[in-house]
Amino acid sequence: MRRSSVNSLARDAEAMPQQHTSRPAPGSELSSVAEHLGPRIKAARLRRGLGLRELAREVSCSPSMISQIENGITMPSVPNLYAICTALGISTDSLVVPEMSFGRTSSSSRGQDGAGQSSPSAHGSKHLSPENRRVITLERGVQWELLTPTPEQGAEFREVTYAPGGGTSPSDPAIRHNGREYCLVLEGELTVHVGFEEYHLSPGHSIVFDSTTPHRVWNAGHVPVRSVWFVMDGGHLQGSD
C-alpha cells in the first residue's frame, strides 16, 4: 500500500476522464435496475412527505436530477445515492429488493426452486451463489454486487467494481456517514482518500476507516478494480463536503 499527501489531488483530478450522464439503453441491465430503483426512491420520498425540490436541497442537486433518477432516465452517483438514502431514512441495499430480477442470470437459468439462494436457516444463516447476486450499476463507472440475498440490518456487504476513472474523484463532494468501512482489493489498484490522507491499495491490501471521516474512493488506473466492501450501519449519511 502506498500513501501520498493530499497535495497530489489536483494533479490526479486533471488526469481523471470526464464522466457523462446518459440515458440507459432500453432493455439493458442499467435500464432494468434504474426502472426499479427510481420508483422505490420516489415511493420513499412520498412516504416522507418530501417534494422534489425539498429532496434536491437535501442532496445538493437539481430537482430535474431527482426526477430523472426517479423516472429511470439515469442512475445516481455513489455520493448522491448515499445522500438520497440518508434524506429518506433508508439503506442503500433496501432499494434493491428480492423481487428485482437478478443481474447475472435469467429466470429460466435460476430454476423455480431458487437454487443458489437459500432461505434463512433456523440459525439465521443465508447462502447466495455468485450467479444469483443482485447487481446495480451506478453513475461514474461503479458497479455493486450485493453479497447477501436480502438487506442486512445495520450492515452492507458487497463486491464493488470500479471502471478506469470510475468512483468518487477528488473533484466530487466527499462522502461521510455513520459507521465503519472495511475494504479488501482483489484486482487493480484502488485510490482511497480518507481525511487528509491518500492510500493506494493493490491486490491483497485492505483498509479500515471511520465512515464519519470525509472520504472518496476511485480508480485512477487503466484497468478495472475489483474489491469487497463491508459497511457497518451503512446508508446513514451525516453530510458531505
PLM regions and their residue ranges:
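Hydrophobic micro-packing sites on short alpha-helices
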Residues: R45, L55, N80-L88, S94-V96
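Short, charged recognition helix plus adjacent turn
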Residues: V97-Q143
